[in-house]
Amino acid sequence: MRANPLASAGIIESEDRSPRLILAANRSHWNIERGPRLERAVFRNDLTPAQALDLCISTNGEMDIVTEVSPADAARVIASEFVKLVVCDANRVLLGIINRYPSDVPLQDRRVRKALNLAVDRQKIITIGLAGYANPLCALTASWCGGFSAGMEPYPHDPEQARRLLHEVGWPAGRNLRIAAPEPFGGIAQLVAVDMQSALDIGIDVIVVPQEKLLAGTRMLVEKKLIPSWDILIFGWFDLSSEAPPAAIHREFFGSDGAFRAGPELPEFNKLYAEMAAQIDGQKLVKVAEQSDRYVYDEALALFLCAPQALYAVNKHVNFGPYRTTFELAETEVDEEHWSRRGAREGSQAAQATQTSGKGGSASFASGSSGNAC
C-alpha cells in the first residue's frame, strides 16, 4: 500500500463550451512592448475542426487561424490561396507506453524493451505516418529543451539485434503482442506493428480504441485499479515548459504519482526526480534532468518514437509566431491587407468622402484595426 494513496490527474469527461469566446485587448497591461497588437480575438467553438479548416483554406474573413492541423491536411493548406502553413518544433512527444505490470509476457525485462525500440524504423514513422512533420527522439526530451543530453542518439533501426535480444529472453509461443492506440494514432500503430512483426517474428494485434471508449480506457490507466490488457499504448503528450521536461513528461509516465505510469513504481527514477524537484540551482537542475532522461533511455522504459511538430493554418495577412509550448496571440498582428483592416479603411474612406461632399458635421469615423483572429 502506498504511504500517500491520494493523487490527482486531469481527465476531461465532458465539455460545455460557449459558441464563441471573445478576448478583448487590455490596453492597460504593463508589458506594452509585447502587446497586444490585436483589438480582439474570437475563438469559434461552434465549428468542428474539419469545418474550421475548410473555412480557413477556402475563404477570406471567416477563419484566420486553425490550430492542430493534421499532417494529412498539410498539403491542402499549402495549396490554399488564402492561408499559409506555419510549422513549429513543439514540446510534444509521441511514444508507446509499455505495460510493465507482471503478466505472461516479459516486458519487465529491459532487454525486451530494448528489442521493441530497435525493431522500429522511426524515420519511416515520421515520413509516412506524419508526412515528415516530426523530429526524432532519443528518449523523452527534445534536443531544444533543457535537460537534453548531447551525447545521446535515438535507438537505431536494427532488426537483427532486436531479434537476438528477444530470443535471449524468450517470448511465449502463440502469444501476440497487443498494441493499442486511439483512433488518431491508428495508422502509427499499424506502422509500428509491421516493423515489430518483421523484426521480432511474433504475431501482433492492433487494437484501435474508438472515441466513445477512450474515456474508460484513460480512467483505467490513471486510476491504476485494473491492469490494462494492452502491451503497448501509442500515446501523445506535451510540455508547457522547455526548462525541465521531467517535471511534466517523465513524471507523468514513470513517477510515483504519474497519471500514465503503467507498471510498478521505479525507485531509481523517484530518487532522481526528488533530487531534481529540490534543486534551486538552475545548472544543477538541468544536470539532474539530463540524468533522468538518460535513465529512461538506458532502461528503455517506453517505445520512443518522435516529437511531432505543431501545424497551423494561418491567413496570409496574419503575422503569427508559434510558441513551442502553448497557443499564444500576444505578439500576433495583421497587416494592412487583412480583411478586418481593409474593411475598416474602406469604410473610413467612404465616410470621409460623404462628409466632405455633404453639409458639414463631425469628422469622426472608424479607424484603426479590428484585428479579428482565430
Task: Tell where the protein language model's regions lie, with residue ranges.
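A ligand-binding cleft/hinge motif common to bilobed small-molecule-binding domains
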Residues: 67-80, 238-244
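Gly/Pro-rich hinge or "lid" segments in bacterial periplasmic/extracellular proteins
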Residues: 1-42, 48-50, 159-160, 164, ...
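A local structural motif
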Residues: 33-44, 62, 172-178, 196-214
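Detector for C-terminal structural segments
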Residues: 16-20, 25, 89, 94, ...
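Short helix-loop capping/hinge motifs at secondary-structure junctions, enriched
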Residues: 29-32, 102-112
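Ligand-site clamp/hinge motif
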Residues: 28-76
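Short helices/loops that flank or line small-molecule/ion binding pockets
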Residues: 50-64, 76-80, 110-111, 190-201, ...
